[in-house]
Each structure stands twice: as C-alpha cells, then as structure tokens.
C-alpha cells in the first residue's frame, strides 16, 4: 500500500530570508509535504535589491534545502518593501504577474494560500499588495479546492495600531471585510480554537480548526542547554524572542524589568530579534546597564540554547495566533509568562506550565515572573511540566492533520494499492 500523492500549489506572502514565524512554518510545512512524496509548487516573495543586504544574508533554511527534492518547484513573485515595515515584502499588483497563469501551468490538485490577507494588501491598508484574492480566479474556473491558512490576528493588529477610538469607528465594516475575505476560499483554517471563535463572530465563513501549527519537539528540547550562549553567566534569565515591533508589545518588557529587578537585583533580561523598534528599545535599555541585553537575531543551535537556558520566557504580545515561540520555549522546558489573549489560553495552563498576565500590565507581568524566580520549587515544577504540555503539537502530528485535511478537500483516498 502506498500513499496517494498530491499536486499542491502553495502561495505564501512570507518566506526565507524574510524572518517571521510564518516564513519558518511555511518552510517546515513544504519540507514535510515533500518528504511524503507530494509534488509542491511554492510561490514565494522575491528578494531583490530594494531590500537591505542584511535581509538577504540571514542564515535561514530555505530554497536550497527544498531544491534537493525532485518533486519540488518554485516561483518568486515580484515584490517591494512593505511601506510600514521595510524589511518585509509585499507582492506587486496582479498587473505585474499572474497567479492564474502559474496555476494553469502546474495544474494543482489543491491550492494553499498562507497569509492570504497580507498578499492581497491588507497589511498596507490596500496601498500595496496583489489587489485580488490570490489563487481564487483559477480555483473557481477549474473547481479546484483552495484553502486559506490563517496566521495573523489582523483585527488585533488593526486595533493595536489605530487605537480604540479609530477602531471603534472602523468596527462596523470589519465583519464585512472578514466575510468577503473568507468567502473567497473553500476553507479557512485556524490553528487556534479561540481565534476561530473570534472570527466566526466577525462573520468568517467556512472556518475550521485544524492544528497545523506545530513545532519540532525533538529539535527544541531541554538538552539544548549544551548550546548555552552565555554559559559563564549564572544570573536568572528572562527571555523574549521575536520581532522588535510595536504589535509585539516589546516596550512592555522594559516597563516590567525594573519592577522585577527591584526584587531580584541580578535578574537578566535578554531580547532576541530585530525590527523597526530596535533603536528605540536599545536607547531605553541603556539605563539598565548590563541588566538588559539586546542580542539581535539568533539562529541555529545558538537560538536553541537560548530557549533551553532561560528561566522564564516572557511574551507580552496580545496579537498572537497560537504563538510559535511560546511552544518552542515550552518544548525546551522553559515556563512561559504570556499576555492573556485568545490563543495563549490554549498554550499556557496557569500554574501548570506558566502564567497568564493581564495585557499591557507591567506590574502583573513582574509579579508573575517574580513568583517563579523566587520559588525554586515552583520553577522546577513548571519546568518539568512545560515540555509534556506541548507534545501534542509536535510538528509531525500537526503536519499529518494538515495532510488529512488536504486529502479530505481533494476527495481522494490517502492510501492506494501499490502496483505490486
């Protein structure tokens, strides 16, 4: 018996060397599908001279790794920098390239669109982007199933950047936009039950929970302490890993730090990542001298070492959708203190593998972290329970569920009799 292979066209608005959680997840997903024998056509953003040289030099797994598979092909669509975030791409308008022509040539069994709203132009308030739902024209004409993979809580982003007043003015049209976006696709899949519920209340059509967003639990592991980037530093370590942007609420880290340091003077806050707020955060961190380290980007075993070394992982963002770094920390045996948001309640069980803090409340974050660091018995208990709590989201398990959904939508059996 052998597995029936599929021809899968996968569009993504973000991919290596553009560093985001979406980019990393897409690469892992495509790699896994190729390992299963499926033919994958990856349509991804082009890296060109409009972006800084630093972007193109990131040591990320990408096309070179996938090109070793005979069943892989790709196309880099033309891009320009996102006007609000110059290190991330936006596709050029459909006048410049045709998703339909690409699909006509490949003739997929199913189309997957990752971060569909971003590709269409929502991240730039429609000032940029493709200008129409990606892949939908071909899907409708050929009756090919097409799914949208939901990554970003866009409504939370809108509220965060516009503020409550402007968001209140815009709120009446949000359900109309959500309904229009979701109606274009055969299925819209969410990795968080709470996020699905939120968007269903906003008129999302054909939404379904599929736990596609896993992590490699064999890769992220407590044993990675052997890769500790600062092995001679014995201070208790609070770790943040992510983009240094406003929506990640990174400034909350520096609001909470002095409150923690007042109780634990030798505490060390390490911020790993880069982004538009990098210089502002560095300027603010100067007053804490050696208590706060802005490490910059981290990759490979060094990053694994940070997750395993940390005593507590902190995530103040309220815009996450089943946050990957939360899971990576837990798999590494590190308790998490995260902002209370729809998806974090599915990752963090209060008092079991970490704590949830009130959003935008530095005092509450500080109290939760102090409680862990001042109580070795509690810290040991949370650490011991962190990894088992997240094993159900191992990458292989989640990828299998994603593949099952593809077979269901295509309507062919997974297993066929071998010719022998």
Where are the model-predicted features located?
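N-terminal subdomain of nucleotide-sugar transferases
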Residues: 1-62, 76
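Donor nucleotide-sugar binding/catalytic pocket of nucleotide-sugar-dependent glycosyltransferases
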Residues: 168-224
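Conserved donor-binding/catalytic core segment of Leloir-type glycosyltransferases
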Residues: 229-258, 270
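Nucleotide-activated donor-binding/catalytic signature segment of Leloir-type glycosyltransferases, i.e.
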Residues: 279-298
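Short alpha-helical donor nucleotide-sugar binding micro-motif in glycosyltransferases
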Residues: 297-298, 305-310
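Aromatic "clamp/platform" in nucleotide-sugar-dependent glycosyltransferases that forms part
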Residues: 318
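Short hydrophobic beta-strand element within catalytic cores of glycosyltransferases
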Residues: 335-338
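Conserved acidic donor-binding segment of nucleotide-sugar-dependent glycosyltransferases
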Residues: 350-351, 355-362, 371-377, 391
